[in-house]
């Protein structure tokens, strides 16, 4: 994958997160902000989830209260390079914990 393809795929991921949060009807408020390629989810309790792109590695990084995760694109799915879990699974787990209620991105 070249840099422009990586940015296109990351932009698609960012847009999917924004759209899913816009349509989410949970009790908690989750704010989504994009600044310079970094997507920040802010929760009512003051905690944050940071998602950013690592262009040189063509990876997406996810920082949560539970820890940091690095994702490579494999077969059209962002997959953690350590655990093999998908980006969506880990994001849902972290968002659910930080929001204090079930958060789904699917």
Curated annotation (Swiss-Prot):
Annotated keywords: Iron, Metal-binding
GO molecular function: ferric iron binding; ferrous iron binding
Signal in keyword set: no
Domain of life according to the entry: Bacteria
Any single GO BP term: iron-sulfur cluster assembly
Cellular-component GO terms for this entry: cytosol
Cited InterPro entries: CyaY, Frataxin/CyaY, Frataxin/CyaY_sf, Frataxin_CS
Function comment: Involved in iron-sulfur (Fe-S) cluster assembly. May act as a regulator of Fe-S biogenesis.
Family affiliation: Belongs to the frataxin family.
HAMAP family from the UniProt entry: CyaY
PANTHER family on file: FRATAXIN, FRATAXIN, MITOCHONDRIAL
Protein known as: Iron-sulfur cluster assembly protein CyaY
Organism per entry: Salmonella paratyphi C (strain RKS4594)
């Amino acid at each position: 994958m070249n840099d422009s393809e990586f940015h296109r795929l990351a932009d698609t991921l960012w847009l999917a997160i924004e759209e899913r949060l816009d349509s989410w009807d949970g009790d908690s408020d989750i704010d989504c902000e994009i600044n310079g390629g970094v997507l920040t989810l802010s929760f009512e309790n003051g905690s944050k989830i940071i998602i950013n792109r690592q262009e040189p590695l063509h990876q997406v990084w996810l920082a949560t209260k539970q820890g940091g995760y690095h994702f490579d694109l494999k077969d059209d799915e962002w997959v953690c390079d350590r655990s093999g879990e998908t980006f969506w699974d880990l994001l849902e787990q972290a968002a659910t914990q930080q929001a204090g209620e079930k958060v789904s991105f699917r």
